[in-house]
């Protein structure tokens, strides 16, 4: 595998949709496990009705207001954790949800769905508000992988369904050939 080069804070401190698209093909490293990000969704500010910060700043959503480059982990349906990365400028609430990955170390495994990937990786509420910068156990790395993706409406929500802010890999042939990952 190519060497993981951690992305800097500036990578996350940009437009959320740009970050969401550029996370496709990046490597998520978490406590000895490495996965290629294959699906993301954007949640942007108080005018996005599906964004947790749509109703303002709360104890739960405080992390979304920055700075960028931190994890935002929360529980849904009382049983599944979701992993997000805080984006944009400090003071503006936004994050990218990581919806799918292809694990490449320690095994080859496709995980579709934010709950599945958090369960497999061992990410839970104790990993909320982790700084992803200068962190040897939890970070995003650039391995130079570019994967084709499509843009669709976000899924699993009831508000803001008109936003085409979901990004999902369309062809993993390159990923499979480089890393022998099975779909």
Curated annotation (Swiss-Prot):
Keywords: DNA damage, DNA repair, Hydrolase
Catalytic activity, EC: 3.2.2.-
Recorded superkingdom: Bacteria
Top class in the EC scheme: hydrolase
GO MF term set: alkylbase DNA N-glycosylase activity; DNA binding
Xref: Pfam families: Pur_DNA_glyco
CDD domains: AAG (cd00540)
One GO biological process term: base-excision repair
Family: Belongs to the DNA glycosylase MPG family.
Name of the protein in its database record: Putative 3-methyladenine DNA glycosylase
Native source organism of the sequence: Rickettsia conorii (strain ATCC VR-613 / Malish 7)
Upper taxonomic lineage: Bacteria, Pseudomonadati, Pseudomonadota, Alphaproteobacteria, Rickettsiales
């Amino acid at each position: 595998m190519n060497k993981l080069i951690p992305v800097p804070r500036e990578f996350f401190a940009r437009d959320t949709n740009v970050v969401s698209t550029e996370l496709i093909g990046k490597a998520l490293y978490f406590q000895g496990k490495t996965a290629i990000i294959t699906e993301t969704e954007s949640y942007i500010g108080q005018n996005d009705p599906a964004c947790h910060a749509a109703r303002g700043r709360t104890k739960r959503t405080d992390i979304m207001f920055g700075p960028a480059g931190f994890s935002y982990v929360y529980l849904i349906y009382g049983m599944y954790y979701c992993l997000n990365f805080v984006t944009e400028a400090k003071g503006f609430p936004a994050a990218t949800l990581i919806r799918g990955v292809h694990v490449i170390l320690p095994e080859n495994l496709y995980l579709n769905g934010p709950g599945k990937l958090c369960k497999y990786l061992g990410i839970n509420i104790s990993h909320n508000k982790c700084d992803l910068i200068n962190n040897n156990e939890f970070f995003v790395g650039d391995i130079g992988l570019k994967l084709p993706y499509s843009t669709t409406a976000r899924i699993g929500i009831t508000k803001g369904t008109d936003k085409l802010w979901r990004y999902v890999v369309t062809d993993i042939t390159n990923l499979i050939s480089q890393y022998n990952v099975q779909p």
